[in-house]
């Protein structure tokens, strides 16, 4: 498949599996799952082997697809609202401040925002006034990241339950607009809690081109099943 594919399945609840293309005849395939699901680290190898055999994944994989290396897993910290952000002249950004999304585990956008906010804070307050710069940075993290983080954590809890997960996907599959913007929202083409923070609203926030592929035939597909993938 030349585009991003995402699968939601009961045994990956509060998580998902993905496929996205890489340069050449290569792709990144994997899954993420929240620790609160009760799945043990030792079980992830079994889930991985089973995942590759599921019909929905087999339909996307090439018949002769082969892994380049052994599969790997690692924990992703997501608690930007609970860690120190500064230590005198040191500002923590990205993973160092656990600025990742608790629903998807993504963190590239958050890392960029936190790094830029730290630089802007120093520029605004001056390098000779670390206390003032720290205060500016703290406010920026709250403005740009904390509300999104808490909103995503709340939504992730809803998705733990079958009724919540099915309801969310049915709503997202209502029409082309909801499908397109669900994909954009899910993978953070705009801030997670944008609709709840009017201070970040801007004209065209839901209608811009976005960081997705548009070939004229649609931009996303949602696969919804009652059985695993």
Report each predicted region and the residues it spans:
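C-terminal helical "tail/cap" subdomain of flavin- and related membrane-associated enzymes
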Residues: 120-229
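Residue-level detector of alpha-helix boundaries and kinks
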Residues: 4, 100-103, 107, 153, ...
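Active-site substrate-recognition segment that forms the wall
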Residues: 6-38, 92-93
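FAD-binding core/adjacent interface of flavoenzyme oxidoreductases
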Residues: 1
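FAD/FMN-dependent oxidoreductases across multiple families
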Residues: 13, 35-122, 127
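Short secondary-structure transition/capping segments
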Residues: 33-52, 170-188
């Amino acid at each position: 498949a030349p585009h991003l594919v995402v699968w939601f399945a009961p045994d990956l609840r509060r998580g998902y599996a993905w496929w996205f293309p890489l340069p050449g005849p290569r792709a990144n395939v994997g899954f993420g799952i929240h620790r609160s699901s009760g799945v043990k680290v030792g079980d992830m190898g079994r889930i991985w082997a089973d995942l590759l055999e599921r019909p929905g994944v087999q339909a996307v994989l090439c018949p002769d697809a082969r892994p380049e290396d052994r599969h790997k897993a690692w924990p992703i910290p997501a608690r930007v609202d609970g860690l120190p952000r500064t230590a005198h002249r040191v500002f923590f950004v990205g993973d160092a401040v656990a600025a990742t999304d608790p629903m998807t585990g993504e963190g590239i956008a958050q890392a960029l925002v936190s790094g830029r906010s730290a630089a802007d804070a120093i520029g605004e307050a001056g390098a000779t006034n670390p206390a003032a710069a720290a205060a500016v940075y703290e406010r920026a993290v709250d403005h740009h990241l904390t509300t999104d983080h808490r909103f995503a954590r709340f939504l992730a809890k809803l998705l733990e339950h079958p009724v919540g997960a099915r309801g969310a996907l049915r709503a997202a599959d209502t029409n082309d607009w909801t499908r397109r913007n669900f994909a954009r929202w899910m993978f953070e083409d705009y801030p997670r809690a944008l609709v709840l923070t009017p201070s970040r609203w801007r004209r065209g926030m839901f209608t811009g081109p976005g960081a997705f592929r548009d070939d004229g035939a649609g931009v996303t597909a949602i696969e919804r099943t009652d059985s695993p993938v």
